[in-house]
Amino acid sequence: SSDLNLDYAGNERNYIFNPYQLVSSRGLYYLVGNHDNHDDMSTLRVDRIGNIKLLDIRRKPLREIQGYHNQNTFDVDRYMKEHIYMFGGESVTVVFEAKRSIVNQILDWFDGNVTFLNETPQKVECRVHVNREAFKYWALQYMQSVKVLSPASLVFDVREAIRDGLSQYV
């Protein structure tokens, strides 16, 4: 299928998209698949897709997508657990520290995909395998209660996002 979208100048742009699964998240529908000129998985909001044309070419095999080299079928349950927001891109193992007061929220977001490690009366250390970009925004959403411990590159990105956001207010 082809996804009609607008670039920054307002011009139409077209994509060749290899679809693998239709999913629903937070009241919206998304098509999970691969932009033909990229090697990773991404998502398109269905309500923003226009001018669809079915092409007479075979879909790219799942095994050719980054992170899916050993898979013949798309595991939608795993994908949804790792992609708490509908961002495409890589999933990574994240370790973070959280106030115990938000354990229920952690379970709401990551149930079945979270391991609780070191626990104290005030804090708990958690490990999740999750979409990197989505977790950055999740950590920002809960920044008063959460501290990312690893990977170091994500710690840096969250710190920079907080610094950039703070500069809007001071």
Model feature map: region roles:
Residues 2-95:
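Core beta-strand-centered patch of the WYL/Sm-like small regulatory domain
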Residues 73-170:
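Polybasic (Lys/Arg-rich)
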